[in-house]
């Protein structure tokens, strides 16, 4: 199962999810050229 983790989650909640369900994936990618943001990708998932 894949579950979205809200950015408002506290560190304790995230650790609890890791211990309870499995792996938390938090990825953030940002591509910019000369100060102009071209691409922004943000993904957070919990894999049980």
UniProtKB/Swiss-Prot annotation:
Keywords of the record, alphabetical order, are: Gas vesicle
Subcellular locations according to the entry: Gas vesicle shell
Q: Which GO terms describe its molecular function?
A: structural molecule activity
Q: Does the keyword Ligase apply?
A: no
- InterPro entries, alphabetized: Gas-vesicle_GvpA-like, GvpA, GvpA-like_CS
Q: Which Pfam families match?
A: Gas_vesicle
Query: Where would you say this protein principally sits, based on its record?
Result: other
The source's domain of life comes to Bacteria
GO cellular component terms, semicolon-separated: gas vesicle; vesicle membrane
The family database entries (PROSITE patterns) matched by this protein are listed as: GAS_VESICLE_A_1
Role of this protein:
Gas vesicles are hollow, gas filled proteinaceous nanostructures found in some microorganisms. During planktonic growth they allow positioning of the organism at a favorable depth for light or nutrient acquisition. GvpA forms the protein shell.
Q: Which family does it belong to?
A: Belongs to the gas vesicle GvpA family.
Partners and quaternary state? The gas vesicle shell is 2 nm thick and consists of a single layer of this protein. It forms helical ribs nearly perpendicular to the long axis of the vesicle.
> What is the name listed in the Swiss-Prot or TrEMBL entry for this protein?
Gas vesicle protein A
Name the source organism: Spirulina sp. (strain CCAP 1475/10)
């Amino acid at each position: 199962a894949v579950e979205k983790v809200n950015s408002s989650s506290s560190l304790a909640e995230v650790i609890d999810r890791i211990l309870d369900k499995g792996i938390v994936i938090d990825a953030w990618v940002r591509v910019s050229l000369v100060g102009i943001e071209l691409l922004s990708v943000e993904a957070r998932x919990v894999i049980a």
